[in-house]
């Protein structure tokens, strides 16, 4: 049965709670209304303490962590690999290659790949062995040799169940051949009763009679006496020798060096491996090192892209890495238009509300999709977080009504839950790394030829941050270079005081003109600035457009 097509529902880089919750909610909604696909909530970055609290509170698994939206090995439709075990004969591998039309066969032992047999492996070993005199047969099960030779078992008095030793073809004078025979060897002989008898008496353990030649009762008596076996085949001695050559186990034929990849490797990386490999293939191993697929050049010629739905953003600078190589199916957002382009027309829903989770919840209601308590709680969390429990200026009446509705479905006291959630979100550990803190919730904006980044950190106490001001300022210089922007702003927002302290590395005149604010002790106090999206970015953008 063909696996369902996967579609990843994913928020912006460094996801906040609304980004995480709307991805979970919308994936759940789509799985209910659109069959034939599986919608997977995903994220690009680490989870915040607030998001972890929400997931634990409602018993939900974290969204799948995706490092890049570039196509990876797991986006290919990998078939179950055809493989053999170490005791398989080279003959059987050759037959498998011919019947399945494949050029490389993995050798697997205890679920781990230990080698690969290629067409050239078989040809090279076969040609090399033809130059060796006498031929040697490696330990091979008697029944397997019978099958490979398509032989008739005339008699079998051998005590051993495996055959090994030198192989002699009766083409020399009999006295010469008898001088070479050792006890336990294999002989190939034609319609020559004296030779058959003499070879068995000398100690041949297995005699292969070619061209369907007759075997007398006298020969059978000696075979019994010597604990030997006699096989009869319909073809000539040379053909029998060729097949015996191919009876050796694949462990003596296979290459022990072979290219491997994982499901997380990008197809660009895999192409480099496959196209530079002698066998023009790579073998896929899972996280436990078990073989789970084979990739050939043909697989890499297909146009493979991850299918994604973007939520809570529509700007290329905020999108997960590799989004330009993905196929965007939908965009669900509540921010300004960011100029993200797509190859094909997409469903784009953008509404000026306080949270993407509000929009997702509305989809449930409009389409009559039942909402479980956990999903209602998840979406409620997204609204409470992104509106700071309705304190941000981006909050709309629709956000308030939807939050109250979701609280009823989730059977929660809205005010108590909101305070608990925001308290978790505003916790800042004393030993936190400044760079890690400032990158938790940062967004990059481009306006004309200028770009700037805005990080926002919620706090209930400005005094703690003031103590670490110098450490944060030093970190800002590094982050500005890391993000490749001209200005880096950090908003420390206090919902209780309904104000933000602004720390920055860049042109401070932008802030002075945008907010008519003065810098004090290296910081700007911006009263009433609560929302990055509505209170801060538009005013900075207005100054840039006016003066640049």
Swiss-Prot record:
Gene Ontology MF annotations: inorganic diphosphate phosphatase activity; metal ion binding
Residues binding Mn(2+) 2: 18, 312, 334, 386
Catalytic reaction annotation: diphosphate + H2O = 2 phosphate + H(+)
Domain CBS: 77-132, 254-311
Cystine crosslinks: none
Cofactor binding remark: Binds 2 manganese ions per subunit.
Region PPase part 2: start-end pairs: 306-548
Name the record gives this protein: Probable manganese-dependent inorganic pyrophosphatase
Originating gene: ppaC
